[in-house]
């Protein structure tokens, strides 16, 4: 039988973890100063007077390179616990991890062929 009271701790955790950021944003909005002068709206560069426009546009290749890095960084985060418990998990989990790695390799080959990894 499906018992809902077994999930009371989950719902309490979900509600509390949702209320904390909402409450933090609300409190910072209430306590923040309202008037913002031109000095507050200028960019801050370590106490030095800013030279030129602070807003500059980056090329898309930097974002693509960062995206590929994040994908493989997340892959490492997922594969490390799997490697530590490889002997306990069995063959089915090995096959799932192999499929996961193969999908990432296909993505890497796609990014490589599209030129996302070329720096020049």
Swiss-Prot record:
Coiled coil: none annotated. The lineage of its organism: Eukaryota, Viridiplantae, Streptophyta, Embryophyta, Tracheophyta. This is NAD(P)H-quinone oxidoreductase subunit 3, chloroplastic. GO terms for cellular component: chloroplast thylakoid membrane; NADH dehydrogenase complex. It holds the Pfam family Oxidored_q4. NDH is composed of at least 16 different subunits, 5 of which are encoded in the nucleus. The chain crosses the membrane at residues 9-29, 64-84, 88-108. It catalyses: a plastoquinone + NADH + (n+1) H(+)(in) = a plastoquinol + NAD(+) + n H(+)(out); a plastoquinone + NADPH + (n+1) H(+)(in) = a plastoquinol + NADP(+) + n H(+)(out). NDH shuttles electrons from NAD(P)H:plastoquinone, via FMN and iron-sulfur (Fe-S) centers, to quinones in the photosynthetic chain and possibly in a chloroplast respiratory chain. The immediate electron acceptor for the enzyme in this species is believed to be plastoquinone. Couples the redox reaction to proton translocation, and thus conserves the redox energy in a proton gradient. Its EC number is 7.1.1.-. It is found in: Plastid, Chloroplast thylakoid membrane. It comes from the Eukaryota. It is an enzyme of class 7 (translocase). It is a multi-pass membrane protein. GO terms for molecular function: NADH dehydrogenase (ubiquinone) activity; quinone binding. Its main location: plastid. Belongs to the complex I subunit 3 family. One of its GO terms (biological process) is photosynthesis, light reaction. Keywords: Chloroplast, Membrane, NAD, NADP, Plastid, Plastoquinone, Quinone, Thylakoid, Translocase, Transmembrane, Transmembrane helix, Transport.
């Amino acid at each position: 039988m499906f018992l809902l009271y077994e999930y009371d701790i989950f719902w309490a955790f979900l509600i509390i973890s949702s209320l904390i950021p909402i409450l933090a944003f609300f409190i910072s909005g209430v306590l923040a100063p309202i008037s913002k002068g031109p000095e507050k709206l200028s960019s801050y560069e370590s106490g030095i007077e800013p030279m030129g426009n602070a807003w500059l546009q980056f090329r898309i290749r930097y974002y693509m390179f960062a995206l590929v890095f994040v994908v493989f960084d997340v892959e490492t985060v997922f594969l490390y616990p799997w490697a530590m418990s490889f002997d306990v998990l069995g063959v089915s989990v090995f096959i799932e991890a192999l499929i996961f790695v193969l999908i990432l390799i296909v993505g890497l080959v796609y990014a490589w062929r599209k030129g996302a990894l070329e720096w020049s």
